[in-house]
Amino acid sequence: AGLKYGYHNHDFEFRTVGGKPIIDRLLERIPAERLVAQFDLGWVHVGGQRPVEYLRRYKGRVPIVHFKDFVQGREDAEIGRGAVGYDAVLPAALDAGVEIIIVEQERFDKSPFESAAISLEFFRKHGLL
């Protein structure tokens, strides 16, 4: 029985202070046993960083991730249909020790059920379902 804190990012944590992204400063100052990273990989991308690199950098410290895809900046898309590059991100997430993937989409250009089915198909295509 224990409590573990996780930090869920958006894009602003990738602004730099003294030449280093805020998220890196946070994760360097708080030990991994006290704080895990719960990267929202879509926001990592929107923040100007590469999700695969962040997963590799914090391998073993990222038990949960959010998959959120974007087209044209901040416009939501189904997983695999946007600019984040989840075909490369998914294997990197699994290699980093991710145990839980939360699919997140807040705006839809079709019904939420159609969008969920499209995102689900991404995971089927990659052998996770």
What are the residue ranges of the model-derived segments?
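Histidine-acidic metal/acid-base catalytic patches
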Residues: V17-F39, W43-L129
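Hydrophobic, well-structured mid-protein blocks that either form specific transmembrane helices
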Residues: A1-L26
